[in-house]
Amino acid sequence: MAAIHLFDVVARHNQWLSVRQSAIASNIANANTPGYKSLDVQPFEKVLESTRLAMNATNAGHITDGATKAAAVDIRKSEPWETTHSGNSVSLEQELINAGDVNRAYRLNTGIAKAFHRMLLASAKA
């Protein structure tokens, strides 16, 4: 059974949420820019899959598998709900929904981390 590094996953998910929030903010800021295409990030599941088998090299002479580098979050063009005559594909409604999803996911993420932190403290006291 493989160890689950919950706090590492929480930190990686928070980083992914931060990048996604930046992409959403950029989309909202460019809502009236002609020809601007809305952006989004790859799903978090793909980020986890790309770094699943990462090994730690404790010495510079160790051979690594190439997966030890942190996977960069891929920012790509999102599927637009609508495109204006100027070619802009930002939908403010869609971006606000995405921002709400990021907020909800961040609160859930921090709630899980707090619960596990409390469990660790309780087990250390016992």
Describe the predicted segments one by one.
Residues 1-126:
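Amphipathic alpha-helical polymerization modules
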